[in-house]
């Protein structure tokens, strides 16, 4: 086991604080509408330019191991805020730095760290309740666009495209961000349920221009097994032919004689038909077939529940207004399922999301909710260069997370104003002893730090602005982009309540741990063994 370097008390805390300040000072320059850029060197390719706090934090690794421990703990604050709300990473870092600096001053003055931490925790719990009381719902498109704009460093085009995407696919829809090919941002919306399985034979194509299969008002047969014998399909085919409507078959696979017969029937115009494989694998395939059944008002023909394909009738088939199938994807538009059943299924999947432990499972379940509830929108980010593309994509993703958080828990006045209003309501809060009171004051003072940093980055006098905002009431605050004092919500400067709340909670949690640190242990660097001396070629002298 390698030897360790151990430091205690103030010696340990000073080193840790140095690391905290190095990381936080690099991150906090990005805060606010006039936040600066940070350039990140990459081992290959062009450097990355970013205003995203968590991207800056993730790049920082310090040579001094004790300083690095402090930096890594603040990095954890940014990462947790990012995971919980998708934004607010810089705010969380600024809050953590302020609490740690103020808290460690009190510890150095002889205060009991445990009581300080209890005081900080009391203040934060009360502040979170105040933030919830200040919160207003964020339902309309204008408010969503404003939240997106603020999160994307005052880029209104980003806010507007996110609001448009949310309007089209609903609050439950999936919105993804991709790198586009054009200079402008583009929005692609897929209505209905789309899954990544294309037609099983190109002979099903009936739209030669687009190379796709278009079925209007089709029946949809859902089968949880492979179909290779055409005799199993005959009763359904005869019923569909009599109804003079097209048929989509979604099965584990359709092969051999069954596929050949379907192709021949389609080409002769006897039955307009297309077949695709069911999406997913294993249990996920069964679940997705059931989703399609509920969306279209049909039944999954499965021998597990005693249903046989030969005995299927038209009542067992789903229906939709239109189905479009390409080589890679199938889209079912306007399924005929019962809305109450669809909402019940969505609620059931949401419960599974709550219980899921892996991010992959959560993502897949969220996709299923979107396909049932709304649709899928893809924002294609446009930029002139690759460097700009990466920077803009980061901002769009942040803004998207922020708008989701705003829809979820509402919004508060932005620009650090909500934290100042929450702190002013807690001026009468007292702890169990004087040291807890100091902890409460540490937290309340730290809650001014985001506003001060926004003002500082804008090149204005932070103390003057902080005093003016503190003297105001309600949503009165300072617009750092224009230098104007007014109602922040009316000016469109909003922060999602969830983002502000998460930033404060995570910052206080990690800062509390750092304040109560009494010893730090790290491995001593290994000393390289001395190189072997050059032996030469002794005893060979005199040779010509």
From Swiss-Prot:
EC class: isomerase
Location of the protein in the cell: Cytoplasm
CDD domains: GroEL (cd03344)
Catalytic activity: ATP + H2O + a folded polypeptide = ADP + phosphate + an unfolded polypeptide
EC number(s) stated in the UniProt entry for this protein: 5.6.1.7
Protein name: Chaperonin GroEL 2
Primary localisation category: cytoplasm
Biological process per Gene Ontology, one example term: protein refolding
Function: Together with its co-chaperonin GroES, plays an essential role in assisting protein folding. The GroEL-GroES system forms a nano-cage that allows encapsulation of the non-native substrate proteins and provides a physical environment optimized to promote and accelerate protein folding.
SUPFAM superfamilies named among the record's database cross-references: GroEL apical domain-like, GroEL equatorial domain-like, GroEL-intermediate domain like
Isomerase in keyword set: yes
Keywords, sorted A to Z: ATP-binding, Chaperone, Cytoplasm, Isomerase, Nucleotide-binding
Source organism: Vibrio cholerae serotype O1 (strain ATCC 39541 / Classical Ogawa 395 / O395)
GO cellular component: cytoplasm
InterPro entries registered for this protein in UniProt: Chaperonin_Cpn60_CS, Cpn60/GroEL, Cpn60/GroEL/TCP-1, GroEL-like_apical_dom_sf, GROEL-like_equatorial_sf, TCP-1-like_intermed_sf
Recorded family membership: Belongs to the chaperonin (HSP60) family.
Gene Ontology MF terms in the entry: ATP binding; ATP-dependent protein folding chaperone; isomerase activity; unfolded protein binding
The keyword Transcription regulation is assigned to this record: no
Annotated ATP binding sites: 30-33, 51, 87-91, 415, 479-481, 495
Quaternary structure and partners: Forms a cylinder of 14 subunits composed of two heptameric rings stacked back-to-back. Interacts with the co-chaperonin GroES.
Source domain of life: Bacteria
């Amino acid at each position: 086991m390698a030897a360790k370097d151990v430091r205690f008390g103030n010696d340990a805390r000073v080193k840790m604080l140095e690391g905290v300040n190095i990381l936080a000072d690099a991150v906090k320059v990005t805060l606010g509408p006039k936040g600066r850029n940070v350039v990140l060197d990459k081992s290959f390719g062009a450097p990355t330019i970013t205003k995203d706090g968590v991207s800056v934090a993730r790049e920082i690794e310090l040579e001094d191991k004790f300083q690095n421990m402090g930096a890594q703990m603040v990095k954890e604050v940014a990462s947790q805020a990012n995971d919980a709300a998708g934004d607010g990473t810089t705010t969380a870092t600024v809050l953590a730095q302020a609490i740690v600096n103020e808290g460690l001053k009190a510890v150095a003055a002889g205060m009991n760290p445990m009581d300080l931490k209890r005081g900080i925790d009391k203040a934060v719990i009360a502040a979170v309740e105040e933030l919830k009381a200040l919160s207003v719902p964020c339902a309309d498109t204008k408010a969503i666009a404003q939240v997106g704009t603020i999160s994307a460093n005052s880029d209104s085009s980003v806010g507007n495209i996110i609001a448009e995407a949310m309007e089209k696919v609903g609050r439950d829809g999936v919105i993804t961000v991709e790198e586009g090919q054009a200079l402008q941002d583009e929005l692609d919306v897929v209505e209905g349920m789309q899954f990544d399985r294309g037609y099983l034979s190109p002979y099903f194509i009936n739209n030669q221009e687009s190379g796709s299969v278009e079925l209007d008002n089709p029946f949809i047969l859902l089968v949880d097994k492979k179909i290779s014998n055409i005799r199993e399909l005959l009763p359904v085919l005869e019923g569909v032919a009599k109804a003079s409507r097209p048929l989509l078959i979604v099965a584990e696979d359709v092969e051999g004689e069954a596929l050949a017969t379907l192709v021949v029937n389609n080409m002769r115009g006897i039955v307009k038909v297309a077949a695709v494989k069911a999406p997913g694998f294993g249990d996920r395939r069964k679940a997705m077939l059931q989703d399609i059944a509920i969306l279209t008002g049909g039944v999954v023909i499965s021998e597990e529940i005693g249903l046989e394909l030969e005995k299927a009738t038209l009542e067992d088939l789903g229906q939709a207004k239109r189905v479009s199938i390409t080589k890679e994807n199938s889209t079912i538009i306007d399924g005929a399922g019962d809305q109450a059943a669809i909402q019940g299924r969505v609620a059931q999947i949401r419960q599974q999301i709550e219980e899921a432990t892996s991010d992959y499972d959560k993502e897949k379940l969220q996709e299923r909710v979107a396909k049932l509830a709304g649709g899928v929108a893809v924002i294609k980010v446009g930029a002139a260069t690759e460097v700009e593309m990466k920077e803009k994509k980061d901002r769009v993703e942040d803004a998207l997370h922020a708008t989701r958080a705003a829809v979820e828990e509402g919004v508060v006045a932005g620009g650090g104003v909500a934290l100042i209003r929450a702190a002013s309501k807690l001026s009468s809060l007292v702890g169990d002893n004087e040291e807890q009171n100091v902890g409460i004051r540490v937290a309340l003072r730290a809650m001014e730090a985001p506003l001060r940093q926004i003002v500082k980055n804008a090149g204005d006098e932070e103390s003057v602005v902080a005093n003016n905002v503190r003297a105001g009431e309600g949503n009165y605050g300072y617009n750092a982009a224009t230098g104007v004092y007014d109602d922040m919500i009316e000016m469109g400067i909003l922060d999602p309540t969830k983002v502000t709340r998460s930033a404060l909670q995570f910052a206080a949690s990690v800062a509390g741990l750092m304040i109560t640190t009494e010893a730090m242990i790290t491995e001593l660097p290994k000393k390289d063994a001395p190189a072997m001396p050059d032996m030469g070629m002794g005893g060979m002298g005199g040779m010509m």
